[in-house]
Structures are given as structure tokens and as C-alpha cells.
A protein has these predicted regions:
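Metal- or metallocofactor-binding catalytic centers and their adjacent structured scaffolds
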Residues: 1-52
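Conserved, mostly hydrophobic/aromatic
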Residues: 2, 41, 54, 105, ...
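Subtilisin-like serine protease catalytic core
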Residues: 52, 62-65, 177
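N-terminal small/glycine-rich loop or linker at the start of catalytic domains
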Residues: 58-83, 119, 124-130
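Active-site mouth loops of central-metabolism enzymes
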Residues: 67-91, 109-110, 137-143
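Non-catalytic positions within long, well-ordered alpha-helices that form the structural scaffold/packing
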Residues: 95-98, 154
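A structural motif
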Residues: 99-104, 158
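Catalytic core of soluble alpha/beta enzymes
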Residues: 107-179
């Protein structure tokens, strides 16, 4: 879909090409595959511009504002393991991420609310009480489940709770959002 639109175009016209592709894709939604496809084109265009000019991306977008950027380690992915094995692995991975010099860590959940709380407890044990950890749910909960997990994460001092419910679950969330 995108290739015929940009194949003979000058890749240095990054803004023009980006808007041309975006205008074609925006009717298909502003998330998911259309935007992921546009992101791939955008990255390629920036890469081409950097190679042609011999400049880093930071220089192309206005200059470097810092020499170091704090980053978090992402691990603790779900696998087909029994819960005790997952808990042990999550605790060990979290500890390893902390000892590697990251400023925080993020874990994946999605087994079920009670099991996920146990996994979060394992991560907290692995990193100790003074290290930020985040939880990525990828919309795996109903609102009631998200509230249950969210309260438990608050007790564990989780730094953030990402995407607990599907954004289109308007019926589920309307009772929990102040008018």
C-alpha cells in the first residue's frame, strides 16, 4: 500500500512523504497496523537523512541535550511455566536488571489478577523496596480486575500500571471515571 506512493519520491523530503502516507492511512485508524507501517517508513526516512548528511538523529532534530539518558530494563515476560517457576524467574530477572545499572524495570502481566499480583510481589522482592518497577498489562483486565490489581500494585509501590483495560471499554470504565 505504501511502497507505490513513495517509491520514486526523494527520501530527503521526509516531512512531505510522512504527510502523504499519513493522509492515506488515517482513515484506517490512528493506531495499530497503519501507524506501525508509517513508523517503519518514518524511521527509514530519518535513517536515510542521517546517512546522507552524516549527522546523528539528535543533531537532525535540534541537538543533543544530554550525554546520558536514564533507561529502564524490560524483562519478566510471560512464558508457559508454572506459577512458582515464573515467580522465581521474575524475581531473579528483576534483581539482574537492577544490578545491571538500569534505573527501573518493567514487567509483563496477563495470567489473571491474583497470579499477576504474586508475580509483582516477586519483582518487588527481586529489586527491593527502593527501586521503581512498572507493570504492563496490555489491556488484559476487566475494570474490576484492574482495580484489584491496581490496589495491590499501590501497596507494592509500583511506579506505573500500563494499559490495564482496553481503551474501547467505555461501558466498563464509565462507572469508575468522575463525570
Amino acid at each position: 500500500v505504501i511502497q507505490p506512493m513513495i517509491l520514486e519520491e526523494n527520501p530527503l523530503n521526509r516531512d512531505v512523504l510522512w504527510h502523504k502516507v499519513y493522509n492515506l492511512l488515517r482513515d484506517h485508524g490512528q493506531k495499530g497496523m497503519p501507524i506501525q507501517a508509517l513508523s517503519g517508513v518514518d524511521i527509514a526516512l530519518w535513517d536515510i537523512l542521517g546517512k546522507v548528511t552524516g549527522l546523528s538523529i539528535s543533531r537532525l532534530i535540534g541537538g543533543r541535550f544530554r550525554e546520558q539518558v536514564p533507561v529502564y530494563g524490560y524483562g519478566m515476560m510471560l512464558r508457559r511455566e508454572k506459577l512458582p517457576a515464573l515467580m522465581d524467574r521474575f524475581e531473579d530477572e528483576a534483581a539482574a536488571i537492577k544490578s545491571s545499572g538500569f534505573v527501573a524495570t518493567k514487567m509483563k502481566v496477563g495470567l489473571g489478577s491474583k497470579q499477576d499480583v504474586q508475580l509483582a510481589e516477586s519483582v518487588r522482592r527481586g529489586v527491593g523496596g527502593d527501586f521503581p518497577f512498572m507493570v504492563d498489562a496490555n489491556h488484559c483486565y476487566t475494570v474490576d480486575q484492574a482495580l484489584y490489581v491496581g490496589r495491590a500494585l499501590e501497596e507494592l509501590d509500583a511506579y506505573w500500571f500500563e494499559e490495564p483495560v482496553a481503551p474501547e471499554d467505555l461501558d466498563g470504565t464509565k462507572n469508575y471515571v468522575p463525570s
